[in-house]
Amino acid sequence: AMEYAIYATVGLLSGLCFYYLARYQIQVRSIYDTENKGQRINNIGYRIAWMVVPAVLFVGIALKEFDYWQTVRYMLIILMAINVAGIDMLIRRIPNALLLGMLLLQICNIVITSGGLDVFMDTFFNSFMGLIIAYVIFVIPGFFKLRIGAGDVKYSAVIGFMLGLQGY
């Protein structure tokens, strides 16, 4: 039970840190927020949600008992995904810094978990093909005049990179 309390506390504190990161990212992009929708993030409900959601998900991670690296990786993915979703919901923008962070996290994962150069190359190729396939899938609607934001296409490509071909 103590372990779950620690995970929940780490989730609360991490969520609070990422909440302030989201506030900063919204403030930086305030030039695009002509209707001041980004100001909604100052509402106490958003702060609570930004803290409670990671806490609950971190306890879920604790229940699965992953190894240390995978636990940290999943926690970072959750925090970055919450920020991407929250910022996109508030101001309709997806920060490239978060997408880059997710790409770097997956590259670190490939380096850490691959045993040698052959495994690294296979895993990286698998992830890269996932990126390409996701990108193509989300670009196709644009040819039919369906509106999908460029940030959504980039985010989908990053998710494709993280999942790889086997993730589909």
PLM region descriptions:
Residues 1-168:
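A membrane-topology feature that recognizes alpha-helical transmembrane segments
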